[in-house]
């Protein structure tokens, strides 16, 4: 269509005026006098949020007309957390199932936001749907009831055939899905179709998809459990003997070999032992695309808790290990070889976790800790000088955002990023109590622990959703967050 220069300028001018008007109408939030901390460093500055994004960072910013001002003097201003490993139910069944996961997007969000986590993940099976229908279903469920933002890992299941098909993989990436998991080497079905899974990981890597691996050798564990039960040693108190460290080590070695042979990126879920971490570190030193997650419980608890009467509360897989393993994981965070902390939140009820009929061969694995994992890491890590606050931000926000293709929209505080911000009180003290938990499970893995440092205010995309102990965000305001196709990230505090 032909158009005069004057007409074109008039339209451009009209667009500029409209954009200016829209910007002027956006709500403004000005956070003053805080210490802004990112993975790269810290600065005393003001932070302007306009609409859903960070608009300006600098000293002595002037408030716009109608701006809400928050005085963050004495506070840390950190990015909202990104939990790369969360298990939520899109919709709870009616009637409820007492022995199943009790948290949906709404209840899981409440705990997350209270703990300073603004973006969670979930694992959803592809089933027989095309990528477009899958994406619509996933986004619809999230945006119907979530308060936190959510990204999704595609679950492969026992049949990897579809994940060897380039068209399926390209369609998934195009719709914002660039990670698969949880791929269970711990299941005997993996070994029965090892070639199929190998081809799926190879094809996924070529398509820009990261494979997330649960690393335990199924045969070692199955034989161990069978032997213990047959010998009358099946009590849950003996569970620490049922899945030895070598089962994790062998599986990590296997996953590293897959990464080396195919070039595909791999993400090792909930690494629990020093020996498994050392295998991954050796792979990183050779430049392989290997990423390590650990789970909060491995940093705070050891296998000694299996002697407690309430042993069921502390059972998950891989199992808890020894003090030397705990120390190695803390060291890995400090030197950058443990890249992320994933809560692996699975909210069984306390009654289900304490079911006395459980044995080493039949138990409910999972921890209710989405609300507490970030405060626990700050209290036990930063407040006790094990790690810096920058490293805290790295493993709980920046690194997961980078690894899973959400950065720089998520995981940082910079102009143009989503305004996911937590005002963190570094000195406030609190005792964790079951009655304060916002999860439907209504208990905490860390009940009775003393915390130093807590979120005071949580802001998700420019909206205050948690403040002074109360969640005020509404279900249905969370968004599905599409991932970018996997590209090798540059991570702070690490050479990978």
Name these PLM-found stretches.
Residues 34, 355-359, 415-480:
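C-terminal cap of metal-dependent C-N hydrolases
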Residues 233-263, 312-314, 334-335, 339-341, ...:
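His/Asp/Glu-enriched, well-ordered alpha-helical/loop segment
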Residues 26-29, 36-80, 96:
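Histidine-rich, glycine-flanked metal-binding segment
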Residues 34, 47, 52, 74, ...:
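Divalent metal-coordination and catalytic microenvironments
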């Amino acid at each position: 269509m032909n158009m005069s220069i004057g007409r074109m300028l008039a339209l451009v001018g009209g667009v500029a005026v409209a954009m200016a008007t829209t910007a002027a109408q956006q709500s403004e939030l000005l956070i003053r006098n805080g210490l802004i901390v990112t993975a790269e460093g810290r600065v005393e500055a003001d932070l302007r949020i306009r609409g859903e994004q960070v608009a300006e960072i600098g000293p002595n910013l002037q408030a716009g007309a109608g701006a809400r001002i928050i005085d963050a003097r004495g506070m840390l201003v950190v990015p909202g957390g990104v939990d790369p490993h969360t298990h939520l139910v899109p919709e709870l069944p009616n009637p409820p199932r007492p022995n199943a996961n009790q948290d949906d997007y709404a209840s899981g969000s409440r705990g997350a936001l209270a703990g300073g986590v603004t973006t969670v993940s979930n694992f959803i099976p592809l089933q027989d749907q095309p990528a477009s229908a899958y994406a619509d279903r996933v986004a619809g469920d999230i945006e119907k009831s979530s308060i936190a933002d959510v990204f999704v890992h595609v679950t492969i299941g026992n049949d990897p055939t579809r994940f060897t098909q380039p068209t399926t993989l390209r369609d998934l990436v195009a719709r914002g899905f660039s990670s698969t998991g949880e791929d269970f080497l711990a299941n005997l079905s993996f070994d029965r179709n090892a070639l199929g899974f190998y081809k799926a990981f190879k094809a996924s890597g070529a398509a820009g998809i990261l494979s997330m691996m649960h690393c335990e050798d199924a045969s070692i564990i199955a034989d161990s459990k069978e032997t213990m039960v047959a010998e009358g040693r099946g009590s849950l108190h003996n569970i620490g003997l049922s899945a030895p460290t070598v089962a994790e080590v062998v599986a990590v070695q296997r996953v590293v070999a897959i990464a080396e042979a195919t070039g595909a990126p791999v993400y090792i879920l909930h690494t629990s032992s020093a020996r498994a971490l050392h295998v991954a570190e050796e792979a990183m030193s050779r430049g392989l695309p290997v990423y390590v997650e650990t789970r909060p419980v491995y940093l705070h608890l050891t296998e000694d808790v299996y002697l407690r009467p309430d042993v069921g509360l502390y059972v998950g897989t891989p199992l808890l290990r020894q003090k030397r393993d705990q120390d190695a994981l803390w060291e890995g965070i400090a030197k950058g070889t443990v890249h992320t902390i994933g809560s692996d939140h699975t909210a069984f009820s306390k009654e289900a976790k304490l079911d006395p009929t459980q044995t080493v061969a039949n138990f409910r694995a999972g921890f209710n800790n989405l609300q507490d994992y970030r405060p626990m890491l700050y209290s036990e890590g930063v407040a006790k000088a094990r790690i810096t606050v920058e490293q805290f931000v790295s493993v709980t926000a920046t690194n997961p955002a980078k690894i899973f293709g959400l950065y720089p929209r998520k995981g940082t505080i910079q102009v143009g990023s989503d305004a996911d911000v937590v005002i963190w009180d570094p000195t406030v003290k609190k005792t964790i109590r079951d009655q304060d938990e916002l999860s439907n499970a209504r208990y905490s893995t860390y009940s009775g622990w003393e915390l130093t440092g807590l979120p005071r205010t949580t802001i998700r995309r420019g909206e205050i959703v948690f403040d002074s102990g109360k969640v005020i965000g509404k279900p249905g305001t969370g968004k599905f967050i599409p991932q970018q196709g996997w590209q090798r990230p540059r991570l702070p505090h690490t050479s990978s």
